[in-house]
């Protein structure tokens, strides 16, 4: 039987992987993927704790996070496509050109 501690350890590992990806990558798509890993780690934690406490609030909150993440990715990928068409790169350092 997998205990709550195993799920929470998985959450911490996934959260660290996502945080490492955000801090170390300079590609905009990799930043989006790392953000999704962070959000999925949090979702696993909410569902695991909700299941452990026999409460549906964890699952409901995880569904809201999934919906918000989907809208974030939809808007973000649209902006990335426009950015790539204009600059022909997905490197985050090119965002410094936006200084007004």
From Swiss-Prot:
The enzyme's E.C. designation: 7.1.1.-
Membrane topology label: Multi-pass membrane protein
Gene that encodes it: nuoK
EC class (word): translocase
Superkingdom of the organism of origin: Bacteria
Family designation: Belongs to the complex I subunit 4L family.
Subcellular location: Cell inner membrane
The reaction(s) this protein catalyses: a quinone + NADH + 5 H(+)(in) = a quinol + NAD(+) + 4 H(+)(out)
Keywords on record: Cell inner membrane, Cell membrane, Membrane, NAD, Quinone, Translocase, Transmembrane, Transmembrane helix, Transport, Ubiquinone
GO cellular component, one term: plasma membrane
Protein name, UniProt field: NADH-quinone oxidoreductase subunit K
Single GO MF annotation: quinone binding
Transmembrane intervals: 2-22, 28-48, 63-83
GO term, biological process aspect, one: ATP synthesis coupled electron transport
Role this protein plays: NDH-1 shuttles electrons from NADH, via FMN and iron-sulfur (Fe-S) centers, to quinones in the respiratory chain. The immediate electron acceptor for the enzyme in this species is believed to be ubiquinone. Couples the redox reaction to proton translocation (for every two electrons transferred, four hydrogen ions are translocated across the cytoplasmic membrane), and thus conserves the redox energy in a proton gradient.
Subunit structure as annotated in this protein's UniProt entry: NDH-1 is composed of 14 different subunits. Subunits NuoA, H, J, K, L, M, N constitute the membrane sector of the complex.
């Amino acid at each position: 039987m997998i205990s709550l501690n195993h799920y929470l350890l998985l959450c911490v590992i996934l959260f660290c992987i996502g945080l490492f990806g955000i801090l170390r990558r300079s590609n905009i798509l990799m930043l989006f993927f790392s953000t999704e890993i962070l959000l999925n780690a949090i979702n696993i934690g909410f569902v695991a704790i909700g299941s452990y406490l026999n409460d549906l609030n964890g699952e409901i909150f995880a569904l809201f996070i999934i919906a918000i993440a989907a809208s974030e990715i939809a808007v973000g990928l649209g902006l990335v496509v426009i950015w790539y068409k204009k600059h022909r790169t997905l490197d985050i350092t090119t965002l410094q050109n936006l200084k007004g």
